[in-house]
């Protein structure tokens, strides 16, 4: 290829001084990384963390993000560093509970998002078991830098939540905005009873949910905020 014969792909083409030969300089795109997140990660490309087979909680939960075996403490959590890339987390189950993000007993998980990329979460269950966007067991701790968008939570059953707490002493903090929409259950819809459908549901004592930015929970039948435990607190929008 020479300067006189170049007819296509003009953008980003340079020519060598020595012989006038054209060259196209580019950085190859990184392939998207797929599969569940099961331990600390620092992303090097867009991350599509999807779980489709039983994995978390000794195989009783299908999850796209959970701590498989990393010892964690308050000062040494399992860190998922998005490193400026996109992150989508999904659970797709046909026989077990679907929890896109699952935080087990005594676990500490932190999602680092310095670039402020949107974190997308979906959870679907073609079985009648529960589906949750984020699920926290007892004494579990989750910190995420948002924005976070839980765009779909669906089950054929009656129990579905954008964020669900089940156990005492757990805490979730989203530093940024939170959107929860399209939470539903086929059985709940059929019966016209939506007691198990919630945006944020807390059933443990001494639990707390904090969102520092704006919150939009809409587009479904059921309760936006549901608390059933003693001394549990939901604080949204800095209030």
Q: Which sequence ranges carry the predicted segments?
A:
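Extracellular beta-strand/beta-solenoid scaffold signature
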Residues: 1-14, 21-23, 32, 38, ...
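All-beta strand scaffolds that present successive hydrophobic residues in beta-strands
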Residues: 28, 33-34, 74-75, 79-82, ...
């Amino acid at each position: 290829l020479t300067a006189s014969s170049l007819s296509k792909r003009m953008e980003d083409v340079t020519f060598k001084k020595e012989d006038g030969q054209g060259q196209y300089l580019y950085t190859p795109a990184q392939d998207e990384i797929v599969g569940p997140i099961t331990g600390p990660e620092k992303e090097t490309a867009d991350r599509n963390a999807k779980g489709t087979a039983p994995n978390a909680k000794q195989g009783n939960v299908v999850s796209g993000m959970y701590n498989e075996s990393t010892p964690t403490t308050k000062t040494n959590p399992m860190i998922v560093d998005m490193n400026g890339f996109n992150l989508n987390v999904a659970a797709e189950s046909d026989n077990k509970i679907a929890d896109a993000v699952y935080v087990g007993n005594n676990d500490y998980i932190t999602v680092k998002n310095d670039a402020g990329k949107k974190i997308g979460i979906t959870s679907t269950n073609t079985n009648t078991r529960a589906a949750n966007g984020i699920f926290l067991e007892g004494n579990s701790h989750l910190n995420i830098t948002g924005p976070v968008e839980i765009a779909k939570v669906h089950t054929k059953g009656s129990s579905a939540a954008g964020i669900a707490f089940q156990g005492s002493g757990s805490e979730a903090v989203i530093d940024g905005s939170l959107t929860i929409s399209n939470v539903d259950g086929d059985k709940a819809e059929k019966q016209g009873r939506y007691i198990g459908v919630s945006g944020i549901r807390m059933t443990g004592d001494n639990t707390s949910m904090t969102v520092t930015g704006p919150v939009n929970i809409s587009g479904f039948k059921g309760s936006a905020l549901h608390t059933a435990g003693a001394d549990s607190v939901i604080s949204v929008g800095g209030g």
